[in-house]
């Protein structure tokens, strides 16, 4: 049973605060309507649970402004699902669609 769930982001301010307070941050852009995204968030939560670490997600349908902001900040074209790994506020890794899984997320840290 995976009890460690990603934390929901619901504002740009909250996102910036998370980046400020944490050196290493995983963020997932999640689409409520996409089956691939449903699998991606399962993998994301499993990864966080295995690592016993916090991670963050936003629902693109609800957080359009934040989603656009992340696209601008990272210069990475918006996809969903899409995962990012931030180190000291910089997105050093990203993946989308079927490329989001426990193994690829673990690889981001290397």
Per-segment meaning from a language model:
Residues 1-4:
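Short, Lys/Arg-enriched N-terminal segments with co-localized hydrophobic residues
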Residues 6-13:
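Short acidic-hydrophobic, aromatic-tinged amphipathic segments that line or gate anion-handling sites
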Residues 16-47:
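Local sequence-structure signature of Cys/Sec-based thiol-disulfide redox active-site neighborhoods
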Residues 29, 53-67:
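Thiol-based oxidoreductase modules, predominantly thioredoxin-like and allied folds used
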Residues 48-53, 104-105:
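Short cysteine/histidine-rich metal-coordination sites, predominantly Zn2+-binding motifs
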Residues 74-87:
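Structural micro-motif
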Residues 85-110:
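Non-catalytic, surface beta->alpha helical segment in thiol-disulfide oxidoreductase systems
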């Amino acid at each position: 049973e995976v009890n460690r769930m990603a934390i929901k982001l619901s504002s740009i301010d909250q996102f910036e605060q998370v980046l400020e307070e944490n050196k290493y941050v995983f963020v997932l852009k999640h689409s409520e309507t996409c089956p691939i995204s449903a699998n991606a968030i399962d993998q994301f939560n499993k990864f966080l649970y295995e690592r016993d670490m916090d991670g963050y997600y936003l629902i693109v349908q609800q957080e359009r402004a934040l989603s656009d902001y992340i696209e601008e900040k990272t210069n990475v074209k918006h996809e969903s699902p899409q995962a990012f790994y931030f180190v000291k506020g910089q997105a050093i890794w990203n993946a989308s669609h079927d490329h989001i899984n426990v193994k690829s997320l673990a690889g981001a840290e290397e």
